[in-house]
Amino acid sequence: MAQIRIHEVNTRIENEVEVSKFLQEEGVLYEKWNISKLPPHLNENYSLTDENKAEILAVFSKEIADVSVRRGYKAHDVISLSNSTPNLDELLINFQKEHHHTDDEVRFIVSGHGIFAIEGKDGTFFDVELEPGDLISVPENARHYFTLQDDRQVVAIRIFVTTEGWVPIY
């Protein structure tokens, strides 16, 4: 279950109902998908082949199709980041630059953890700490950045309206 940390006051929201309510009020789509469907050989696997990525997409194809129909998404892929990723530190520096997109930024966490820091409606930032099974959609034009948690590894399904709209605007 995702957790929220509000930057300015350093308070946390950990209750599932309160997390969902907070994100809904901020215009952030949050869903919990059934991660137990993931085959054991793909659980915590950060060295994915193209076949592994296709299998992950197949396992969650119903959920991807459902959210895509509801939200107008048209493309998806799988990304894996870990300490074995070439230039991981350089990638994280780029990810941590505050930016926005002209489309939603959608991630479903398959393995590992990630944090989206999002500028709230009141102008203050909050972290959404994600774990396997969490799906988040950062709304278009919302200022945000992404980073990894202490384990420095994540496998995520990325879902797009268009890949062109996903280009960061700093």
UniProtKB/Swiss-Prot annotation:
Note accompanying the cofactor annotation: Binds 1 Fe(2+) cation per monomer. Binds 1 nickel ion per monomer.
Positions bearing the site annotation: May play a role in metal incorporation in vivo: 98
InterPro entries the UniProt entry points to: ARD, ARD_bac, RmlC-like_jellyroll, RmlC_Cupin_sf
Keywords, sorted A to Z: Amino-acid biosynthesis, Dioxygenase, Iron, Metal-binding, Methionine biosynthesis, Nickel, Oxidoreductase
Cofactor requirement: Fe(2+); Ni(2+)
Enzyme Commission number(s) of this protein: 1.13.11.54, 1.13.11.53
Binding site for Ni(2+): 99, 101, 105, 144
Catalytic activity: 1,2-dihydroxy-5-(methylsulfanyl)pent-1-en-3-one + O2 = 3-(methylsulfanyl)propanoate + CO + formate + 2 H(+); 1,2-dihydroxy-5-(methylsulfanyl)pent-1-en-3-one + O2 = 4-methylsulfanyl-2-oxobutanoate + formate + 2 H(+)
Record-marked site positions (Important to generate the dianion): 107
Associated pathway: Amino-acid biosynthesis; L-methionine biosynthesis via salvage pathway; L-methionine from S-methyl-5-thio-alpha-D-ribose 1-phosphate: step 5/6
Site (May play a role in transmitting local conformational changes): 104
Binding residues annotated for Fe(2+), in chain numbering: 99, 101, 105, 144
GO BP field: L-methionine salvage from methylthioadenosine; L-methionine salvage from S-adenosylmethionine
Family: Belongs to the acireductone dioxygenase (ARD) family.
Subunit record text: Monomer.
Function noted in UniProt: Catalyzes 2 different reactions between oxygen and the acireductone 1,2-dihydroxy-3-keto-5-methylthiopentene (DHK-MTPene) depending upon the metal bound in the active site. Fe-containing acireductone dioxygenase (Fe-ARD) produces formate and 2-keto-4-methylthiobutyrate (KMTB), the alpha-ketoacid precursor of methionine in the methionine recycle pathway. Ni-containing acireductone dioxygenase (Ni-ARD) produces methylthiopropionate, carbon monoxide and formate, and does not lie on the methionine recycle pathway.
Protein name: Acireductone dioxygenase
Taxonomic source organism: Bacillus thuringiensis (strain Al Hakam)
High-level lineage: Bacteria, Bacillati, Bacillota, Bacilli, Bacillales
Recorded name of the encoding gene: mtnD
